[in-house]
A protein has these predicted regions:
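Early extracytoplasmic/lumenal segment of secretory-pathway proteins
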Residues: 19-84, 335
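Short beta-strand->loop
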Residues: 25-28, 92-100, 110, 113-115, 126-128, 140, 148-172, 227-249, ...
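Ligand-binding pocket segment of bilobal, Venus flytrap-like solute-binding proteins
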Residues: 167, 172-241
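An extracytoplasmic/periplasmic, membrane-proximal ligand-sensing/linker region
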Residues: 177, 288-335
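A structural signal for short loop-to-beta-strand junctions that line the ligand-binding cleft
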Residues: 69-74, 92-124, 140, 150-153
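Periplasmic-binding protein-like
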Residues: 149-156, 273-297
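A bilobed periplasmic-binding-protein/Venus flytrap-type ligand-binding module shared by bacterial periplasmic
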Residues: 123-130, 242, 250-263, 282-283
Length: 335
């Protein structure tokens, strides 16, 4: 009831003060965002209203709200979420010179229905001095029986894993992807549970030797109030695997404008702001993500992890192969 009330208030407010706010449906769950939204509010006087939930729930909500949806901007933490929103005809093309000039083609939808705001890489994290660094070079290696009982990775309902498997499909086809997923399952140290940081902590504490995690979580563990996270990550090192015929797996967090956005101008301003130099710097320094704007550097900590070459497949493929990836995870018994 309360939820319903809040929503109708939102609709009403957006109708009355159309030019003074932007309604953001966001799957991002990082503190930096609060700071960014505040910066935008101070700069433009446009109030940012945020609804936070998983992309799948936000997409369902926009669908059921239909033409009356108050959503202006959809932000996801994964390319497949944006792809799904576009496929369901929930987004619209964004007419912005700034965005098309500054965000490279591989990091946006071909009809400009969404733009990446940050890049993140899904990598291997191992103990400093561990033999893993000599034994593992590629994502394909993760399925090698020599790593039996060594891998800590979260569950298959997580979009970061789904996109990684989507990339495996893009490189090798579905048949190989199933063999690969079965191989990784056979190599798991434990049944999947917890988030990316949980996997890193487990390996730091001697459970398995390979944790699979997104890069920025390592930064967030270093820069953490919780001593147990700092202690765990101080023992660890990042290894950037690559695909046999490609580079290191890249995913994006990005934004699109909702099809029935009541504050379209504000929505575009908001996304342009998130792609501006100041905002990109904060994504880099505050959340340890890779900026998408040319000329903005990664944080010192992130740079210290080393360089890698982005995978060669198109980011859109992650969305195209998502359904197949989910099915394959199921068949492989990846919990
Ligand atoms: Fe995340």
């Amino acid at each position: 009831m309360l939820k319903k009330l809040a929503l109708s208030t939102l609709v009403l407010t957006s109708a009355l003060f159309a030019s003074n706010e932007v309604n953001v449906y966001s799957h991002r769950h990082y503190d930096t965002d609060k700071q960014l939204f505040k910066m935008f509010e101070e700069k433009t006087g446009i109030k940012v209203n945020v609804v936070k939930a998983k992309a799948s729930a936000l997409i369902k909500r926009i669908e059921s709200e239909g033409k009356k949806s108050p959503a202006d901007v959809l932000i996801t933490v994964d390319a497949a979420g944006l792809y799904a929103a576009k496929s369901k005809d929930l987004l619209q093309s964004i007419n912005s010179n700034y965005l098309t000039t500054n965000i490279s083609e591989n990091l946006r939808d071909k009809d400009n229905q969404w733009f990446a705001l940050t890049k993140r890489s899904r990598v291997v994290v191992h103990k400093i001095g561990s033999d893993v660094q000599n034994q593992l070079k590629t994502y394909e290696d993760l399925a090698d029986p020599k790593f039996k009982g060594q891998i800590m990775v979260r569950s298959s309902n997580n979009e970061y894993n789904q996109s990684l498997l989507a990339a495996v499909i893009a490189h090798h086809g579905e048949e190989y992807a199933l063999t690969w997923a079965k191989g990784v399952v056979a190599n798991m140290a434990k049944e999947p549970k917890g988030n990316d940081r949980y996997q890193v902590k487990a390996v730091a504490n001697g459970i398995g030797s390979i944790a699979i995690a997104n890069t920025y979580y390592i930064g967030k563990m270093v820069d953490n109030k919780d001593k147990s996270q700092r202690d765990a990550v101080s023992k660890m090192k990042i290894l950037f695997p690559k695909f046999e015929n490609g580079g290191t797996h890249i995913n994006v967090s990005g934004a699109g404008v909702a099809k029935y956005s009541p504050n379209k101008e504000n929505a575009i301003k908001f996304i342009e702001f998130l792609a501006s130099k100041d905002a990109q710097k904060l994504f880099a320094v505050g959340n340890y993500e890779y900026p998408v704007l040319k000329g903005v550097e990664s944080s010192k900590l992130v740079s210290s992890w080393g360089e890698f070459k982005d995978d060669t497949i198109s980011i859109n493929t992650l969305g195209e192969n998502n359904k197949a990836a989910v099915k394959i995870f199921d068949k492989a018994g990846w919990k």
